[in-house]
Amino acid sequence: HLVPETRIVEAIPRYGRTYRNRSSARDYVRFCRALWHGELPHSKEIKRLMALPGRDRLTTGAPSIPAGTKVMNKTGTTSHLVGDFGILVARSHSGKAVPYAIVGIVEKRSRASSFSAWTSGRGRVIRSVSDLVYRALKAQYDLV
C-alpha cells in the first residue's frame, strides 16, 4: 500500500474546508518517490502540474537554494495546518541531477486567530528548514 498512514474520512467540499483527513510526512515522501520513478498513474502529468510556476514554501525566499532549482510541489493551508511537500531537483557541480523529497507540515490544535500571520509565519519556518536541508545536501553531494 503506497500511503498506509493516510486516512480519508470525509469528502473534500467545494471550497476545500476539510479538517479530519490525515496523512503523514512518511506517506508524502512515499508519494514523491513513486512519482519521481513514474510508478503512479499519470506520473508525467502530475509532475508537470506540480512544477507549474508559483510561490512555494520550499524554495521561494530560501537564500541557499539557487534560483532555477526545479521544484515540483503541493502546498496546503487551513486555519489549523500550513504545509508544503515536493521534489526538488538540485544540481551538482558536475551537472548531475540530485532529486530529493522534502515535507514541511506545521499543525495547530486550535484555529489560528490571524490566518495571514499564521500562514506567513509558518511558511517561513518551512522555508528555513528547507534551506537547512539544502545546505546539508550541498556539502554531501557537492551541489551548486
Where are these regions (language model features)?
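Mid-domain, small-residue-enriched loop/turn segments at the edges of structured enzyme/sensor domains
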Residues: H1-G38
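Structured C-terminal helix/loop/strand segments within mature extracytoplasmic catalytic/sensor domains
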Residues: F31-K70, T75-V144
